[in-house]
Design a protein with these regions (language model features):
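Extracytoplasmic metal-acquisition and chelation regions
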Residues: 19-309
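Positively charged n-region of N-terminal signal peptides that target proteins for export
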Residues: 1-4
């Protein structure tokens, strides 16, 4: 099944004095949404390299310079990409930035308390422990996996770009409306694809799929790692192994950014099938306006294929 957002770009006359802002984005799904809103007017820059981990990334000097010089930075927030926070704080006061996690219209969910186990924190390093506490005592930052948030953000991005570039405000708005309609159609397709299998329990590599699961009513029985993909403790692995050995979990999913060895070890002898590798941030996809649809649609297809097998 292919999932494609068709973007009908509004045709507008060229305005001689229009100055399209340079836009920098943090992760592929945000980059895709901004690219759809900008359309033919400009191309946003993506910071997260292909195949990189959004939780643990280092900006190159050229990227830090791009952040410093950007007319607008659109990002999720420090809860997801703390490596971008310091670069943003170094920008001049009043420099334009749009943090999507903190946007009033963003639908948020908290990490489940079941995801925190005392053993995890007793056996991990101080640095990792601090990171786990930070990731799991607040809101789950994987907010783009709810397509409703994607639709809301398109409007926010268009408004912000229109404020910086009034001459092209109507184009940004038209592009955002077309893209939002595409996400709505995609959402209906995904819901129909997952409906026959949504009650079947699955386990994921890390706790990144709460928004996707809640939106589509999926039955996530647990995850190997916490929301920041830090190494799990022995007690956590033991509990999850017991869940798998009970025989109710049908599929366990690795991720493209992480070695599948631990998933294979956990699944061995349990009867749980190992599904295709999930890609919650789209790090394996070709960046561009179609990446958001490809991310959500591909995730749905991977889950459905394993549960139907």
């Amino acid at each position: 099944m292919r999932y494609i957002i068709t973007l009908a770009l509004a045709a507008t006359p060229t305005v001689a004095l229009a100055e399209v802002p340079t836009v920098v984005t943090d992760i592929p799904p945000v980059h895709a949404l901004v690219a759809q809103v900008m359309g033919d007017l400009g191309q946003p820059e993506l910071l997260l390299a292909k195949g990189a981990d959004e939780h643990d990334f280092q900006l190159r000097p050229s990227q830090a310079a791009a952040v410093a010089d950007a007319g607008l930075v659109v990002w999720i927030g420090p809860e997801l990409t703390p490596w971008l926070d310091s670069a943003l704080k170094a920008r001049p006061e009043g420099a334009a930035a749009l943090g999507l996690l903190d946007a009033e219209a963003t639908e948020l969910r908290a990490y489940g308390e079941v995801e925190k186990s005392p053993d995890d924190h007793a056996h991990e390093s101080h640095d990792t422990e601090e990171h786990d506490d930070h990731a799991h005592d607040g809101m789950d930052p994987h907010v783009w996996l709810d397509p409703g948030n994607g639709q809301v953000w398109l409007e926010l991005i268009a408004v912000r770009l229109g404020e910086l570039d009034p001459a092209n405000a109507a184009t940004y708005t038209a592009n955002a409306e077309a893209a939002a309609a595409g996400i709505a159609a995609l959402d209906s397709e995904i819901a129909a694809r997952l409906a026959p299998v949504k009650d079947k329990p699955v386990v994921t590599f890390h706790d990144a799929y709460g928004y996707f699961g809640a939106h589509y009513g999926l039955n996530f029985a647990g995850s190997i790692a916490l929301g920041d993909a830090a190494s799990p403790g022995a007690a956590r692995l033991s509990d999850l192994r017991a869940t798998l050995e009970a025989g109710e979990v049908l599929c366990i999913f690795p991720e493209v950014q992480h070695d599948p060895a631990l998933v294979e070890q956990m699944a061995e002898g349990t009867g749980a099938r190992i599904g295709g590798a999930l890609d919650p941030v789209g790090s394996s996809l070709e960046p561009g306006p179609g990446a958001y649809a490809a991310l959500l649609g591909g995730m749905a297809e991977t889950i459905a294929e394993c549960l139907e097998g």
